[in-house]
From Swiss-Prot:
Transit peptide: 1-21
Region (Disordered): 482-547
Membrane disposition: Multi-pass membrane protein
All ranges on the Mitochondrial intermembrane side of the membrane: 22-86, 134-144, 201-304, 350-363, 426-432
Disulfide bonds: none
Residues that bear Phosphoserine: 519, 527-529, 537
Phosphothreonine: residues bearing it: 523, 526
Family the UniProt entry places it in: Belongs to the major facilitator superfamily. Sugar transporter (TC 2.A.1.1) family.
Positions with biased composition (Low complexity): 517-529
Residue spans crossing the bilayer: 87-107, 113-133, 145-165, 180-200, 305-325, 329-349, 364-384, 405-425, 433-453
Official protein name in the record: Probable high-affinity hexose transporter ght8, mitochondrial
Encoding gene (name): ght8
Annotated keywords: Membrane, Mitochondrion, Phosphoprotein, Transit peptide, Transmembrane, Transmembrane helix, Transport
GO molecular function terms attached to this record: carbohydrate:proton symporter activity
Length: 547
């Protein structure tokens, strides 16, 4: 398998995000479809011949997928440690398909809809841990941010396509209105299952469990290089040495993720993923129909479609933003931008939307839609993709599955709290709710400035060194970091220049003491190069960093 094909297949893994987005994007429109309301709503107004939901039922139907997702995040870790990421992804995809079938057959019980949402959420939550983690481990360091961003791109693509499907089905008759929107999600799961079946396991995982030969074969195929090549040798020995050091203490327990060497990153990942929800994006995506109806828009389906199109289109920018500008700056600027847009949205909605005679001010409504789109413009390129990138690349392999599970669980917890309580809060304070999200976005920008390191261009092993180095996040990172990645890139460029010459004839690029890799004994464990040496005096426990 060549590198290009590897990248294409890694994008297939992003179908996990598409499945999540399709669920998020469809439920808001489905709950507003006439046939669905007639079967599952608990209120009926005979005067207007309309159905509606109590706040509790609305929150349960919409938000219970997040409860399942929280559980799925935790369950993903032990299964992944046993059978690996690739097979785990295939297993959870089957769980997802069963959940969709349960949703489509849920007539006439709204409880079955709720249970089916929980079941589907199990798969969505597990895949939200597995997919970005798998991409981070297999992707080249220079492309990791872009490739992991495809997960969020797939989320927004799923949301947009679901909105298009809702737009086309909401005028159909009887159960076809909502069953088509739900049932088409089976297609995404099938595509995901087929795609992942062709993808190899993560070399890092294989080395961690002692399958070095298989890992080497995959590394050679991914890079289209022989085993003796310097890139393969360097990458293998770096991963091997780090895996041995990390696994020396045995498999990590849940308590170990609070140890001195990883505690800081455990809470950072949890905080970043929680703050991603607290930015308020799902306020629009889950309740966009109610929001736009409140602004006086005649066609909430069309309004939601416009917002979802902006979300999807702008996420393409995120593919480049995180590689060109790094992780920190986009998150900081994004948080400030989103705070401003939410503040204006809330102020206009609270003060200008409703006239004294009770009618809606359509100009004010248009302003609110514009600032909603400006919020999405920022979120789609910053907090949407970057949160998954940070979680996917911040943890060493010994802790990765459990730390990522905890971080993503925080995301789903806040997702549930926001989706469940939004109907109650909106009924109580209306558009003033936006002030809360404005404050959360500003807080998020401050937390990134104080606690998150810039990791652009570093290998996963170098990121681990960075977090252990004691460097302040807002200061320039240590100069010795990133040398291995640069050396590998130099070797790759030279290997392309000689069009397949033997590695023995390539110029030796290891000027920093990188180990000689010409030996045939490539599976023996060797020390890292001097450029990657870790003097004890340069490293501190993470909890002492800000002492």
């Amino acid at each position: 398998m060549g590198k290009t094909l590897t990248i294409v297949m890694l994008v297939f893994v992003s179908m996990a995000g598409w499945m999540f987005g399709a669920d998020t994007g469809s439920i808001g429109g489905i709950t507003n479809m006439r046939d669905f309301q007639s079967r599952f709503a608990d209120r009926y107004n005979p005067v207007t011949d309309t159905y509606s939901y109590s706040s509790a039922r609305q929150g349960l139907i919409t938000g219970m997928v997040n409860v399942g997702s929280m559980t799925g995040c935790i369950l993903s870790s032990p299964l992944m440690d046993r059978i690996g990421k690739r097979v785990s992804i295939m297993f959870w995809t089957i769980v997802y398909l069963i959940g969709i079938i349960l949703q489509v057959t849920a007539v006439p019980s709204w409880v079955q809809i709720m249970v089916a949402k929980i079941w589907t959420g199990l798969a969505i939550g597990a895949l939200s841990v597995l997919a970005p983690g798998f991409q981070s481990e297999v992707a080249p360091a220079t492309l990791r941010g872009t490739i992991v961003t495809t997960y969020q791109l797939a989320v927004t693509g799923g949301i947009f396509i679901a909105a298009c499907i809702n737009m086309g089905t909401h005028k159909l008759h009887k159960t076809a209105q909502w069953r088509v929107s739900m049932g088409i999600n089976l297609l995404w799961g099938i595509i995901m299952f087929i795609g992942i079946s062709f993808l190899p396991e993560s070399p890092r995982y294989l080395i961690a469990i002692g399958k070095d030969e298989e890992a080497l074969d995959i590394m050679c195929k991914n890079n289209v290089l022989p085993r003796e090549h310097e890139i393969i040798q360097t990458e293998y020995h770096v991963i091997k040495t780090d895996c041995e050091a990390e696994m020396a203490g045995g498999p990590a327990t849940w308590g170990d993720i609070l140890g001195a060497d990883i505690r800081y990153r455990t809470f950072l990942g949890l905080g970043v993923m929680s703050l991603q929800q607290l930015t308020g994006d799902n306020y629009y995506f889950y309740y966009g129909f109610e929001v736009f109806e409140g602004t006086g828009m005649n066609s909430p389906y069309l309004s939601a479609l416009i917002l979802d199109a902006v979300n999807f289109g702008c996420t393409f920018g995120g593919l480049f933003v995180l590689e060109f500008f790094g992780r920190r700056m986009p998150l900081i600027i994004g948080g400030v931008w989103q705070s401003i847009t939410f503040f204006i949205y809330a102020a206009v909605g609270n003060r200008a939307l409703t006239r004294k005679n009770g009618t809606s001010n359509h100009r004010a409504g248009a302003v609110m839609i514009v600032f909603s789109c400006l919020f999405i413009f920022s979120f789609a390129q910053t907090w949407g993709p970057a949160a998954y990138v940070i979680v996917g690349e911040s943890y060493p392999i010994r802790y990765r599955s459990k730390c990522a599970a905890v971080a993503t669980t925080g995301n789903w917890l806040w997702g549930f709290l926001i989706t469940f309580f939004t109907p109650f809060i909106s009924d109580s304070i209306g558009f003033k709710y936006g002030y809360i999200f404005a404050a959360c976005n500003l807080c998020a920008a401050c937390i990134i400035f104080l606690f998150a390191h810039e990791t652009k261009g570093l290998t996963l092993e170098e990121i681990n060194e960075l977090y252990l180095s004691g460097a302040k996040p807002w200061m320039p990172r240590p100069e010795n970091l990133g040398q291995a990645a640069k050396q590998q890139q130099e070797v790759l460029e030279k290997s392309r220049g000689v069009q397949g010459e033997s590695a023995a004839h390539l110029e030796n690029v290891d000027n920093e003491g990188m180990e000689d890799t010409s030996s045939n004994d490539i599976t023996s464990s060797t020390s890292s190069s001097e450029g990657r040496a870790k003097p004890e005096s340069n490293y501190v426990d993470e909890q002492d960093r800000y002492a």
